[in-house]
């Protein structure tokens, strides 16, 4: 049996209903990449009753490297996720195919009346159980206040919010726990903002 203390990443860290069932090779690529850079995934997403929608908020988001290690972890976990990105990225031949393969959905924010929150709610309401990964900061640049979109999405789809973090000081991605929402958006956002201060981003000055 593999010693969990030495484990890099495993599909056992997420419930079976949220697994993508990708080829073993894809999972091995993710694990190899994390191992090559000395990274690992700690913690797990607990099993839930039924196919519930889970909004995973990940931070602190300070660099494009978050996405690099995040995708490697998703492959290693064999996680079936949904995320949203700029439509222009999906127009690039190789990158666009990769993002779509990983569960990405393009969003054209230049169109009137179209926002990430509305697109997320529309897409998640059609899914029978999904892991939506989102950055509550909404940008890699420094911001004083987190965006409340994930709270609005969660309320609309009657899901659960799960905390995850990037820690570049200890080279790990942390799958922590479900967030016990108070119902007061300002208090919940302040709690999440403070929570992420426990971890060191690639560019700490951006958080």
Question: Predicted segments — roles?
Answer:
Residues 2-41:
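Extreme N-terminal tail/first-helix region
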Residues 19, 39-198, 203-207:
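Soluble catalytic domains of membrane acyltransferases
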């Amino acid at each position: 049996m593999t010693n969990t203390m030495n484990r890099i990443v495993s599909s056992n860290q997420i419930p079976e209903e949220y697994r993508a069932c990708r080829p073993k090779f894809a999972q091995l690529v993710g694990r190899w990449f994390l191992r090559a850079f000395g990274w690992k995934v700690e913690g797990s997403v607990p099993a839930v009753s039924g196919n519930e929608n889970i909004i995973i908020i990940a931070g602190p988001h300070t660099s494009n490297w978050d996405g690099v290690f995040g995708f490697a972890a998703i492959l290693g976990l064999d996680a079936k996720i949904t995320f949203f990105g700029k439509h222009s990225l999906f127009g690039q031949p190789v990158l666009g195919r990769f993002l779509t393969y990983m569960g990405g959905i393009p969003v054209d924010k230049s169109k009137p009346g179209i926002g990430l929150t509305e697109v997320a709610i529309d897409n998640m309401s059609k899914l029978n159980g999904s892991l939506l990964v989102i950055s509550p900061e909404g940008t890699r640049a420094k911001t004083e206040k987190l965006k409340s979109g994930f709270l609005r999405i969660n309320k609309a789809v009657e899901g659960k919010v799960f905390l995850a973090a990037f820690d570049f000081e200890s080279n790990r991605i942390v799958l922590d726990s479900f967030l016990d929402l108070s119902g007061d958006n300002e208090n919940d956002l302040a709690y999440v903002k403070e929570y992420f201060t426990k971890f060191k981003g690639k560019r700490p000055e951006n958080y």
